[in-house]
Amino acid sequence: MDQEIYLIGLNHRTASVEVRERFALTDCTVLEQGVVPTGDDISEVVILSTCNRVEIMAVGNGPGVPARVLDCWAAARGQKRSDLEPFVYVHKGIDAVRHLFSVASSLDSMVVGEPQILGQLKDAYRKAVGRNATRVVLNRLLHKAFSVAKRVRTETGVASSAVSISYAAVELAKRIFGEMSQYKAMLIGAGEMAELAATHLLNSGIREIMVANRTFERGLQLARQFKGEAVLFQDLSVRLAEADIIISSTGAHEPIIRARDIKDVLKRRKNRPMFFIDIAVPRDIDPDVNNLDNVYLYDIDDLKEVVEENMAQRRDEAAKARSIVEEEAGNFAKWLKSLDLQPTIVDLLRRSERIAQDELARTLKRLGPVDDATREALQAMLCAIVKKVNHEPITFLKRRFDEEEAGTRYIDITRRMFNLDCDDVPDDAHSDRKHTQQRDDA
């Protein structure tokens, strides 16, 4: 295959939450349209942007692909490539495939085994397909990533004791407050992470849950699910005074809670402590809030300690999962390599079929009128001959191509042997027929 798979990204290991916030791609439209102009050096792209990572999968020609992607990415965020490069990793070929399979299987997550990343990857793929940004290679790669993730979950226990970011947030709250039954929590946002947080809060014995969401109906639905109260988003600054624990996970582009807002809230609370956990990227809560007395603000990076304690339980299972990823990455690499062989197989079959059809036409001309049944029988016979004659050469070619590094040499030999780069069937293709006819005439 002339084109190569690239994966360019940053994540919670290479970049702080501040950096991830700066380069988050909450709307990937501009970038996808910028990276895939028709007929340019990049033909396919899928963009995954979550609170813990931004990763761009691209199929393109030449070593300049990563720089091109980085330029578009930085420009989409109003930054320069030089601002982005220190935090970025670039994977190519099978390394890109292996990394994506690890991401899909949640082996590269802050919380190994958490289920959210697979849904986020599927959503990213759906959006790319909707914008016609994928073709054969990424379509195959993403679907394979989904099946690898399913296999990892089925064949290993990597997810059995996994904690989600939402679980880690609630565990952190329990460490601060201890007994939760006397406290009231507010969830800002009503997505999957908020729903998970509500589940864990309820299990921890929280006294009451409030849900504030821009779309009131969705907030109301979540609140009812957990016997809580829905709050109008415009009343957020007023109702915050009732909450001891606030967990925020919206998709806002700018902070929705600022220090000046909390100063007023603290006065109404008579300076009773407030505990904020911001698990959104970009962040929902202005970091300056943490400078206020009686306010404790934690962001997604602060949850690592809780997560690390859970890691030891899953190390053995993660090792099994990585073996699966390695195996499947190797299988995908073979398929990718086979794309180089496919045109030769197609050309070989077409050549045989063209010769067969020419011979059929000559034979029918010599025979004169024949009925449809005879014509169909002759056609079926020729198709069978073409398949059987080509079966052994194609099987040999595939086997040698898979087994040996010099697979491209076999392609070259085959193309030259059968004259596959010539548009027309050579005149000597009919030489046997001519010699046979001369003997018949003698």
From Swiss-Prot:
Pathway assigned to this chain's UniProt record: Porphyrin-containing compound metabolism; protoporphyrin-IX biosynthesis; 5-aminolevulinate from L-glutamyl-tRNA(Glu): step 1/2
Residues that hold substrate according to the record: 50-53, 109, 114-116, 120
GO molecular function ontology, one term from the record: glutamyl-tRNA reductase activity
Domain of life: Bacteria
Domain notes: Possesses an unusual extended V-shaped dimeric structure with each monomer consisting of three distinct domains arranged along a curved 'spinal' alpha-helix. The N-terminal catalytic domain specifically recognizes the glutamate moiety of the substrate. The second domain is the NADPH-binding domain, and the third C-terminal domain is responsible for dimerization.
Additional note from the record: During catalysis, the active site Cys acts as a nucleophile attacking the alpha-carbonyl group of tRNA-bound glutamate with the formation of a thioester intermediate between enzyme and glutamate, and the concomitant release of tRNA(Glu). The thioester intermediate is finally reduced by direct hydride transfer from NADPH, to form the product GSA.
NCBIfam families: hemA
Name of the protein this chain belongs to: Glutamyl-tRNA reductase
Natural source organism: Nitratidesulfovibrio vulgaris (strain DSM 19637 / Miyazaki F) (Desulfovibrio vulgaris)
